[in-house]
């Protein structure tokens, strides 16, 4: 299993791959492929739980999913995404919630959707041995403020992201997620910091890339413009279910090999 230090050593040397997973089966599949990092994202809210956004995801839901993924993954670094309002209001509560993901559920690190308010928390978590990944740019938990739109389209906001990247690095963040920002800004952030940058809709100059699993394999009904579909699992699943229904309705399933009989039961009445 790679450590945070191993991941940092990859920056600028070898592209870092990160995918989301929300259950043990998916985590096992993703882990077997050799992906470097599995993010148990609060994207589960709209990816698999049927919500319109990530805001309804609870701490207990996240904890359950993190535990499942940690049990399914043997080699990848497992990062727990801290859900909306599970951090930030009170430092002690934030630390307890983040620590729970490592101590009770088996995560290796946590991720915070970041801003000026998370710099001090990142420093404190790092001091306590809780590796922390920062997330800048489009932060879905702020959807009611910013929407799901491109971020840092102007110079002032771009400078703020660059400053926040440096501040979170200084506070001890071990990596940065950069979401839906201009590629040339992401390149400048990557150049400005010594910790890995992992992009999603942020161009190819980041040290790594992350996407949502359901987008990658083609399970999502719709995907953001920066996602790429590499398979059609939704279609394959639908085909398999159609075949199952046809087999049951036609009497082809179950076959004799799918059940057993006991001779002594033949004379029951």
Curated annotation (Swiss-Prot):
Keywords, alphabetical: Coenzyme A biosynthesis, Cytoplasm, Magnesium, Metal-binding, Transferase
The annotated regions of Basic and acidic residues compositional bias extend over: 252-262
Q: Which residues bind Mg(2+)?
A: 42, 81, 113
Cofactor(s) essential for the protein? Mg(2+)
The enzyme's E.C. designation: 2.1.2.11
Q: Which reaction does it catalyse?
A: 3-methyl-2-oxobutanoate + (6R)-5,10-methylene-5,6,7,8-tetrahydrofolate + H2O = 2-dehydropantoate + (6S)-5,6,7,8-tetrahydrofolate
Show which residues constitute the signal peptide.
none
Q: Which Gene3D superfamilies match?
A: Phosphoenolpyruvate-binding domains (3.20.20.60)
Gene Ontology CC, one term = cytoplasm
Q: Does the keyword Nucleotidyltransferase apply?
A: no
Q: Does the keyword Iron apply?
A: no
- The disulfides recorded in the entry are none
Top enzyme category: transferase
Comment on bound cofactor: Binds 1 Mg(2+) ion per subunit.
Q: In which pathway does it act?
A: Cofactor biosynthesis; coenzyme A biosynthesis
**Single Gene Ontology BP term?**
pantothenate biosynthetic process
Give the quaternary structure.
Answer: Homodecamer; pentamer of dimers.
- Protein family per UniProt: Belongs to the PanB family.
Q: What is this protein called?
A: 3-methyl-2-oxobutanoate hydroxymethyltransferase
């Amino acid at each position: 299993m790679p450590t945070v230090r191993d991941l940092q050593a990859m920056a600028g040397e070898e592209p870092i791959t990160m995918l989301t997973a929300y259950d043990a089966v998916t985590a096992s599949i993703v882990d077997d492929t050799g992906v470097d990092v599995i993010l148990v994202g609060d994207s589960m809210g709209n990816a698999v739980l049927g919500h319109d956004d990530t805001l309804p995801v609870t701490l207990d839901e996240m904890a359950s999913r993190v535990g499942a993924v940690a049990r399914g993954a043997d080699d990848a670094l497992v990062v727990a995404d801290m859900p909306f309002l599970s951090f930030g209001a009170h430092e002690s509560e934030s630390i307890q919630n983040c620590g729970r993901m490592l101590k009770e559920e088996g995560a290796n690190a946590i991720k915070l959707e970041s801003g000026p308010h998370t710099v001090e928390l990142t420093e404190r978590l790092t001091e306590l041995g809780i590796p922390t990944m920062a997330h800048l740019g489009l932060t879905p938990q702020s959807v009611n403020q910013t929407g799901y739109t491109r971020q840092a389209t102007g110079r002032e906001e771009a400078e703020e992201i660059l400053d926040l990247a440096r501040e979170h690095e200084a506070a001890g963040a071990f990596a940065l997620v950069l979401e839906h920002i201009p590629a040339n800004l992401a390149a400048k952030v990557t150049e400005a910091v010594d910790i890995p940058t992992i992009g999603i809709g942020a161009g190819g100059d980041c040290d790594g890339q992350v996407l949502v699993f359901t987008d990658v394999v083609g399970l999502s009904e719709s995907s953001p413009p920066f996602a790429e579909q590499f398979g059609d699992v939704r279609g394959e699943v639908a085909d398999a279910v159609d075949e199952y229904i046809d087999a049951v309705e036609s009497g082809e399933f179950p076959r004799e090999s799918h059940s057993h009989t006991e001779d002594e039961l033949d004379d029951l009445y």
